[in-house]
A protein has these predicted regions:
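Phosphate- and divalent-cation-binding pockets in alpha/beta enzyme and binding domains
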Residues: 16-18, 96, 116
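ATP-dependent carboxylate/phosphate-activation module, predominantly the ATP-grasp catalytic core
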Residues: 107-168, 172
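A short alpha-helix capping/helix-coil boundary motif
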Residues: 26-31, 74, 137-139
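A ubiquitous structural signal for well-ordered alpha-helices
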Residues: 21, 97, 159-163
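Active-site nucleotide/adenylate-binding loops and adjacent lid/helix of ATP-dependent enzymes
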Residues: 37-113, 121-127, 153-154
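Conserved residues at the C-terminal ends of beta-strands
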Residues: 10, 66, 133
Length: 175
């Protein structure tokens, strides 16, 4: 007889299913640590996520609308990790990928290392803990080789505080 205390889905694709109202009502007496459907959709869609973060005063890469500057990043609006992200060097490359990917964002290209912050938020919206990782090798959008980093902890802490003040984020979240 095993007793389940809490279920923590770790993939944003799993969360899509678990936030649906008919599934939510059957979630093992609400023992699943997960945010509501609307907030999940906000964070899962890159465009709405950047707007949400910017509204909290959190710096995000510039979304290019009118002025296209190469190189740039083309990324799918929906998704997680680095899946569907393309570095675009020329107008020809841009034309090619715009035909292949229907819903996308064009973003400024930032040179340097890629970091991700893994967070776990309590049901009341406070952050239980977070970890900064450098993404060193990617496969299928996820980091297959990463290294923990204590860089930027003060800056990350201030971002986490802004996210906590919303009271809307619950469960595992990666930024």
């Amino acid at each position: 007889d095993e007793k389940i205390d809490v279920i923590i889905p770790v993939s944003s694709y799993d969360m899509n299913a678990f936030t649906e109202p008919e599934v939510k009502s059957k979630r093992l007496d609400n023992k699943m640590l997960i945010m509501d459907k609307e907030m999940h959709r906000t964070l899962h869609n890159k465009e709405s996520c950047y707007h949400f973060l910017a509204g909290l005063g959190i710096c995000t890469p510039e979304v290019l609308v009118d002025q296209i500057r190469f190189p740039l990043i083309l990324k799918q609006k929906e998704g997680s990790g680095s899946k569907g992200i393309k570095i675009i060097e020329t107008a020809e490359d841009l034309g090619y990928w715009k035909k292949k990917i229907s819903e996308y964002l064009l973003m400024e290209y930032l040179e340097g290392k890629e970091y991700t912050v893994d967070c776990l938020f309590r049901d009341n919206g406070t952050c239980l803990g977070w970890n900064v990782r450098e993404r060193m090798k990617m496969n299928g959008g996820g980091a297959v080789i990463s290294q923990n980093s204590n860089l930027y902890n003060q800056k990350v802490s201030k971002v986490i505080e802004k996210l906590e003040r919303t009271g809307k984020i619950r469960g595992p979240v990666n930024f």
